[in-house]
A protein has these predicted regions:
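Bacterial N-terminal signal peptides
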Residues: 6-15
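Active-site-adjacent substrate-binding region
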Residues: 325-349
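Solvent-exposed, polar/charged alpha-helical surfaces in well-ordered, non-transmembrane soluble domains
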Residues: 66, 72, 251-259, 263, ...
């Protein structure tokens, strides 16, 4: 079945008040109430600003809706602690950290924002769908499967797109069109040719007048030709967990296992392997994400070790955030179980920073639990890094066989 990308554009930023509790949203999703004092405008700033679905929090932070480009215009309707509440549609709000935005006192809200013409084309790495926009308006992206589908919501825009210029034969995109679903929601569809999600990104050009939906070309379906990134978790002043029996820090173990994986991949003929760190150095999550964005691997494998306050909890596990990348994590988990480890599970919608990028398939491997005596003994065995590396490599081979 053909894959499908869906892009949803939602019309008109709607605002409420900046009091402790949100007011009832404005009734119109098309015309902004430009005379109301109950909102103010901000623009995103800094590295990797993101919106969250709500005010919840845990050790991984709140549930992320999407990362945003810089300079994106948002309409603040309320404030809660360290977050602003922004209106995306008459019924959908998002939360963003106050430190991720700067006040915009110059821009005036328009009564409506209209999309212009589109153009599709390809270069040597990506298919592009470029939408003419009147402003840097917010968006979010999600993946779907069966059929594969990408959904991107653009908020604050109504269609005035009267032609879509399609230049040449695209490598990944079969067709693209749109439908105005309701006031405040424009849905853009993109049929895909590939059977696997290989990654996408959404960003504005330097003028803010073009929104580029960029679909990554599938690489060669051969392990030797893949560009694989390997991330050794923690490092430097971030020691991670430690075992109760041997006391070895997670940051040391992740580097040992990552090096073993690099060696195994090169032994299998993989020509390009990128390591986020090779020494005991401190790297923040944003630094790793930006490093990987610049490097643009075909896939990312991140190595960690689990821990629990209950020492009977045990097993190996793999994690993903985006459903389109789940197949990679499933086959690797199946191979990891062959090591005699119990299965802790295949965990989805995981809010780990390196599971967040949409530009490339990624898999977080939690080898086993340092807090469990049996798992820790397995982890510390001198042959285990090599065995784990082999199973991960075999999982990659299995995954490539799934691709049509």
């Amino acid at each position: 079945m053909k894959n499908l990308i869906v892009v949803i554009c939602s019309c008109c930023l709607l605002f409420m008040s900046s009091h402790a509790q949100p007011k009832t949203p404005f009734s119109s999703a098309i015309t902004g109430n430009t005379s109301s004092p109950d909102f103010f405008l901000v623009r995103t700033k800094g590295i990797l600003p993101y919106m969250e679905y709500g005010p919840g929090d845990d050790r991984l932070g709140g549930a992320k809706m999407t990362y945003l480009d810089s300079g994106v215009l948002l309409k603040v309707i309320d404030s809660l602690g360290t977050d602003y509440i922004v209106a995306l549609t008459s019924s959908l709000h998002a939360f963003i950290q106050k430190t991720s935005v700067i006040s915009d006192t110059v821009t005036k809200v328009k009564s409506h924002y209209l999309s212009g013409n589109w153009k599709t084309y390809q270069d040597n790495r990506f298919d592009h769908i470029v939408v003419t926009m009147p402003e840097r308006l917010p968006y979010r992206g999600t993946m779907q499967v069966s059929p594969n589908r990408l959904i991107i919501d653009l908020f604050g825009i109504t269609s005035n797109t009267n032609w879509i210029t399609q230049v040449g034969q695209l490598r990944e995109v079969a067709n693209t069109w749109y439908e105005q679903m309701e006031n405040g929601m424009l849905r853009v569809y993109v049929d895909l040719k590939s059977s696997m999600h290989w990654g996408y990104s959404v960003h504005y050009d330097s003028t803010g007048s073009k929104l580029d939906i960029r679909i990554k070309h599938a690489p060669a379906k051969n392990l030797k030709q893949l560009f694989v990134a390997v991330d050794a978790g923690h490092g430097g002043n971030n020691t991670g967990a430690a075992g109760d029996i041997y006391g070895k820090a997670e940051k040391v173990l992740t580097l040992e296992y990552a090096r073993a994986l690099e060696k195994e991949l090169k032994r299998a003929g993989v020509k390009r392997v990128f390591m986020t760190r090779r020494t005991d150095t401190s790297l923040s999550m944003p630094e790793r994400i930006m490093m990987l964005r610049d490097t643009m691997p075909d896939i990312l494998l991140s190595i960690h070790f689990n821990s629990s306050s209950v020492d009977t909890v045990n097993g190996t596990s793999t994690f993903y955030r985006h459903i389109g990348f789940r197949p990679l994590t499933q086959v690797i988990l199946n191979r990891m179980k062959q090591l005699g480890l119990n299965e802790f599970g295949n965990v989805g919608s995981f809010n780990f920073a390196l599971s967040g990028p949409t530009e490339y398939p990624n898999c977080l491997v939690e080898v086993a639990f340092l807090s469990n005596p049996a798992d820790e003994r397995f982890i510390m065995h001198k042959k285990s890094p090599e065995k784990v590396a082999r199973k991960i490599r075999e999982g990659l081979t299995d995954w490539l066989r799934l691709i049509k």
